[in-house]
């Protein structure tokens, strides 16, 4: 089990230090998730609680990764993103697949198998699997918009566009194509900001769907 305490498989611009918080800039940027989560929780309501808890969970797991800088904490970070995309998939697929219990079990098994595959193959396996789940989510949203089960497609496109912009900065950071001495402006940090904003915008999007007259 020693490999779980080894160094992560992805090296970003901010080098890990021998400190209580290994990557202080990246760790600090996770505050964006905490702020978004608290704002959502203060709004009240079912969707605000759901997305507020999601934001807090993603931010906390990501902070643990940046603070401890181990392969195990990298898995925590990836787990947070898998949980996020899993919830989004459930919200969409529950409008397509009527048996919600089977859907929930199927998604849970799929996410668990994804995490196992990440542990086995390491490298960028987590990012590849997460990318595949994102593609499935995009396809489900396009289907729901085209079949009029969802509306406000422009609002969803803006949220996804912001996520995509952050992901591009993340890629630049992971490949060391864009690095700055001020770590709060490095790609991984920017990815945190855009993800926190995306979670809030997706909350607004799904709240609009819940308030729509039933078709």
Language model regions located:
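Multi-pass alpha-helical transmembrane bundles in non-GPCR membrane proteins
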Residues: 1-215
């Amino acid at each position: 089990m020693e490999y779980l305490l080894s160094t992560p498989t992805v090296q970003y611009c901010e080098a890990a230090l021998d400190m209580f918080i290994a990557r202080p800039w990246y760790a600090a940027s996770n505050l964006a998730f905490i702020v978004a989560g608290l704002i959502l929780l203060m709004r009240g309501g079912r969707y605000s609680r759901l997305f507020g808890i999601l934001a807090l969970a993603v931010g906390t797991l990501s902070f643990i990764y940046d603070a401890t800088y181990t392969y195990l904490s990298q898995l925590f970070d990836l787990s947070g993103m898998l949980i996020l995309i899993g919830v989004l998939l459930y919200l969409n697929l529950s409008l397509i697949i009527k048996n919600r219990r089977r859907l929930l079990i199927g998604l849970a098994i799929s996410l668990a198998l994804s995490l196992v595959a990440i542990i086995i193959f390491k490298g960028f396996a987590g990012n590849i699997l997460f990318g595949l789940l994102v593609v499935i989510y995009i396809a489900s949203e396009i289907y729901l918009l085209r079949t009029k089960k969802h509306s406000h497609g422009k609002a969803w496109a803006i949220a996804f566009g912001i996520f995509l912009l952050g992901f591009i900065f993340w890629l630049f950071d992971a490949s060391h194509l864009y690095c700055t001495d001020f770590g709060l402006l490095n790609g991984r940090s920017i990815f945190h900001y855009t993800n926190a904003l995306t979670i809030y915008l997706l909350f607004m999007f799904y709240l609009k769907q819940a308030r729509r007259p039933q078709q």
